[in-house]
Amino acid sequence: MEHCFGCLKDNVRGFCSSCERKLFNRSKINPQLKFNWEDISKVIEGYPAGFSISGVQTKGFIGKATGTELSPTLSEGDKSIYIIKPLLSRFNLPSDSPANEHVTMQMAKQIFGIRTAECCFMKFANGTPAYVTRRFDYNKNEEKLNQEDFASILQAKKDTSGKYKYQAKTYEDFGDILSPLNKVEFIRILIFNFLTGNGDAHLKNFSLLETQDGDMQLSPCYDLMNTKLHVNDSPIALNLFRELERTSLPRGQFYSYSINDFIELGNRFKIRDGLLKKIVIEFTGADQKMKIMIGKSFLSDVAKEKYLETIDRNYRQLFLS
């Protein structure tokens, strides 16, 4: 069965009308690109070497849709409306990384209603997979919006080796910055990241974005993926609490998270008990929906099986331990 390259809707060749509108301003774009990775303007993310995947992630910038195609080059003055990522060549299951990020972003958005950047799965001219996302730091008039990541907001310092001192910053520290509404959203994102095996949600993977009213709110999610498919990653990127529950353990021991830890973080954020209970119920019964979407994804059969194992393992740990 064919699925939409954007939302994975059944019986769709290419993109459904809804994804054409959200991603390409109603243009009928071919998911088979006419260019290759080598043809694109690109940068290597300037993350410290200590990052598991982001430290070597390369992003390309492509322009507006022209007819039925995306443009691989930007003329002077043009804006890079889309970001494109190739496969991760240096990790396990490299060809699955674009489909991994794509399906993880879709699960966050469709199953849990988490705000995410609009994204899709595509293929380069040579057939290799690509992940494409529409930038959210431009408004409808293509005017640049202010965006600042939490490495900057929390003023994370680098040590002499160039690595961020992650032990000095925790997810609890985000509560000093986030609005009450954003704190609820943030808890839901953290639970989702744990369940999907995202051990790479560092300070730079969260941002505040300027709204139409000029204030700064938590941006849509980006860079969501199951990092366990590609590296032997930690369960979460940062400690939940300022007590440093993860990194304070003796070497070789691992902190076993349960849903009560996330509830405790919610309590410290002063989120109402009834709302926290509602969040727990929402996630408790969603594993089957996640498995169905993984089954429809563009992942290889091997990657699908490993992703399903991640979901089963983390659901057991979070809700049954």
Predicted regions mapped to residue ranges:
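Anionic ligand-binding catalytic core segments
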Residues: M1-L203, S207-S321
